[in-house]
């Protein structure tokens, strides 16, 4: 009898102990030590607990506690009020058994996504370096920057979580973090003097469609959505599958904005991309449900794609047009850093810094500096002469000593000829002996060129055209 009672006691102890383990709060990967929460907002925190269990969250910055109850499946979610930038703080979460998140910072959070040019780390790719990265890595230790890289994953169904962890900003971690994102974050942190959290969720070679949720395709009927019940392997190019696995699990995490560097894999469909780019932004904003957060992206850099396919200048044009299609967005131009035989420009600092200029001006309201390259304002034709004026050229235009060689003009016969281009006080004057009656202008409208037109602040002009002739 005594033996039987002892056995029952052991079984009960095991049941009680396992019940405690089961009751322990579980958090998604996005919540952890060294994380950054968006400042001055109602920041969502969520996770798993035992079903119908009370969960309490206590924040060290104001000692305030927030409570909620998990549903019948153990899911819970609440919001905490975050103060102005600061830290480090602690967050304690308990459903009877407490866990503590340490070194929590309050500041500015940005999600960074795209294909290989966003994925490219500070260490670069094999035989493809990042310019000046070794020195930047050496001096990268900064307690006010935290880094999170989402592990690559794809899914036909929305997932609740992904793999990754918040890391402190030091040489070992920066070497393996997105270069464009790091240079952006470093400049934001230095300029604002607040903590910055960077979440990199990118996958090389991918199109834009995988990064949009199913709800985002309602207006894009040319995109075929996948069968969620299909068996076997599927491509990371499949619409929705990267949003489901690499963006969706963090939807709701409070952020200031998004960064995007992608487009090379969509270069043959510029007309569709012009719609899909703002479509992705509106989709993410809708999924987050926190208003029109800022979103800035890089225009693809010039590269020699060869003779097949559509001239990638049309994709750059689509990106330029998209940049004014909806509020709260902007485009960083990279016309001066492209490499003829390398689709991954080494100058990733240019990408990150130009994105940061956009954010500092348009999101944070900083004044007294330029944040964009020259943008065509008006074209006038006087006989055989074409005159162009530009916005974002307050102090004029320059080539920094180079010759203007990338302008072409055409008449009604649609034959383009190199134009003699002269920078004037008002803008640029163009002419060609082969074109007596010009009707249109194109600048740097090729797969690969090295852009030579800048404003005096050093920002390059995008390739552009003034015609709407057939894309080919």
Predicted regions and their residues:
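Bacterial N-terminal signal peptides
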Residues: 9-18
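Bacterial N-terminal signal peptides that target proteins for export
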Residues: 1-9
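Sec/Tat signal peptide C-region and signal peptidase I cleavage site
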Residues: 19-23
């Amino acid at each position: 009898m005594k033996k039987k009672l002892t056995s029952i006691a052991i079984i009960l102890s095991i049941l009680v102990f396992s019940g405690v383990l089961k009751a322990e709060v579980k958090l998604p990967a996005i919540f952890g030590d060294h994380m950054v929460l968006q400042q001055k907002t109602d920041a969502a925190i969520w996770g798993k607990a035992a079903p119908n269990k009370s969960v309490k969250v206590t924040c060290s910055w104001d000692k305030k506690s927030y409570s909620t109850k998990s549903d019948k499946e153990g899911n819970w979610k609440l919001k905490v009020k975050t103060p102005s930038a600061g830290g480090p703080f602690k967050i304690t979460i308990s459903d009877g058994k407490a866990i503590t998140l340490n070194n929590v910072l309050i500041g500015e959070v940005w999600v960074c996504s795209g294909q290989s040019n966003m994925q490219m780390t500070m260490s670069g790719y094999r035989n493809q370096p990042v310019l000046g990265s070794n020195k930047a890595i050496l001096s990268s230790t900064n307690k006010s920057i935290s880094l999170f890289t989402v592990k690559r994953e794809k899914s036909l169904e929305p997932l609740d979580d992904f793999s990754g962890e918040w890391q402190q900003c030091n040489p070992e971690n920066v070497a393996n973090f997105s270069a464009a994102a790091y240079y952006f974050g470093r400049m934001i942190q230095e300029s604002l003097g607040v903590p910055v959290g960077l979440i990199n969720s990118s996958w090389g070679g991918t199109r834009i469609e995988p990064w949009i949720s199913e709800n985002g395709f309602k207006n894009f009927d040319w995109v075929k959505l996948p069968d969620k019940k299909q068996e076997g392997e599927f491509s990371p190019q499949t619409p929705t599958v990267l949003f489901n696995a690499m963006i969706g699990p963090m939807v709701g995490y409070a952020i200031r904005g998004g960064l995007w560097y992608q487009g090379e894999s969509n270069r043959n469909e510029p007309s569709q991309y012009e719609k899909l780019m703002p479509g992705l932004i509106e989709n993410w904003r809708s999924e987050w449900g926190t208003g029109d957060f800022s979103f800035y992206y890089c225009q693809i850099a010039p590269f020699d794609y060869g003779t097949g396919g559509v001239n990638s200048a049309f994709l750059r044009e689509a990106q330029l047009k998209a940049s004014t299609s909806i509020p709260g967005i902007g485009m960083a131009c990279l016309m001066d850093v492209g490499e003829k035989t390398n689709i991954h420009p080494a100058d990733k600092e240019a990408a990150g810094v130009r994105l940061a200029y956009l954010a500092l001006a348009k999101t944070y309201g900083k004044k007294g500096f330029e944040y964009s390259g020259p943008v065509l304002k008006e074209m006038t034709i006087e006989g055989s002469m074409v005159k162009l004026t530009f916005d974002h050229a307050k102090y004029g235009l320059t080539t920094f000593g180079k010759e203007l060689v990338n302008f072409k003009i055409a008449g009604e016969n649609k034959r383009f000829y190199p134009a003699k281009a002269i920078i004037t006080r008002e803008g640029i004057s163009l002419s060609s002996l082969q074109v007596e009656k010009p009707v249109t202008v194109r600048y740097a409208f090729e797969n690969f060129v090295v852009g030579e037109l800048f404003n005096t602040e050093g920002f390059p002009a995008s390739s552009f055209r003034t015609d709407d002739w057939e894309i080919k």
